[in-house]
Amino acid sequence: GMVKDKQNKKALENVNVSVHGSNIGTVTNAEGEFALKIKKTETPRELDISHIGYVNTHISLEKETTAMLTVWLTPHSNLLNEVVVFAENPRMIVEKAINKIPLNYSDKRDMLTGFYRETVQKGRRYIGISEAVLDVSKTAYTNRNINYDKVRVEKGRRLLSQKASDTLAVKVVGGPNLGVTLDVVKNKGALLDFEELNNYEFWMAESMLIDNRMQYVINFRPKVILMYALLYGKLYIDRERLSFTRIEMSLDMQNKSKATTAILYKKPLGLRFKPQELSYLVTYKDVDGKTYLNYIRNTIRFKCDWKRKLFSTSYTVASEMVVTDRKEGVLENIPNKEAFSLNQIFYDKVDEYWNPDFWGN
């Protein structure tokens, strides 16, 4: 199906689409399109559609239909009738939300199923597209330790390969592991650590609605200069439950040398690397009083040129994972020999996971 804005008719990206009463879901792509692959024995009767700044929608489905479903979402016209006074300390709200992570998030070992995609663009042309179905084993959020969280690639495929004529091969290191490393709530080393908070200043922005629930929106940016590049962005926190529901952050690009260190793994001799952007989007979803990881996207933009050449070339590398299913209280862990390593390159290994029936089962 496709999801569009009811007022301006534009397609909506990153809209949550889930089967009502289940853990099965996905998000829309850049064209507003989505697809849910569901077993015949589990034919859904209703879909839940939600997006930041829009009214939640529930769609009833016929028994069988092959028609393309179009869903129209209505923007929230500011539903705050009362005047909101930002009397609370934003740093204090963030600290309270951190303290409530063990209560608000899963207290069991869960096994997530995720759909992963990484793309490489040279200018506007796609030169590489790879996809995978992942298992992500997560321990409880009570101790916020990711050392025992692992990712296993179940199957993969390469839709578009980089050509020999491309003068530069661009690859992502450890890409499928973003379901572990970029789970900002679980991985306190990413941002949400009390000591790390001292490096930032926080201030309130206008409140927003997500899933028909009011959110604190708190901006943050660096207030100190360190040896490494810091982040800036927005934290969305459920006002009632004090759970993190959405995190938008980008790497500070003021010092290009620090930014390069954070982004670049290795490059050919004689290539000049110019970082432009490193941004992250992480969303979480409330299900029956607990909040779970839902979607992660990592976008890197940079320019490259070779010494003695006049013109540079722009590249955009995007990695994303959407959680499509979740099993709670799973005791099984992914064996180390089956886990995808942080220093492995999925593009190079995708043929090992090739499955002609990629969308089957």
What are these regions (language model features)?
Residues 70-200, 211-214, 260-264, 268-361:
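Surface-exposed, low-complexity/disordered segments
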Residues 15-19, 32, 47, 85:
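Hydrophobic beta-strand segments
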Residues 23-33:
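Short, acidic Ser/Thr/Gly-rich low-complexity loop/linker segments typical of extracellular
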Residues 1-12:
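Structural motif
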Residues 185-239, 243-251, 282-286, 291:
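Extended beta-strand-rich segments in extracellular/periplasmic secretory proteins, especially
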Residues 19, 46-59:
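A short, solvent-exposed loop/turn motif at the edges and junctions
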Residues 34-36, 67-69:
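Short strand-edge motifs at loop-to-beta-strand transitions and within beta-strands
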Residues 26, 55-68:
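Structured interaction patches on ligand/partner-binding surfaces of diverse proteins
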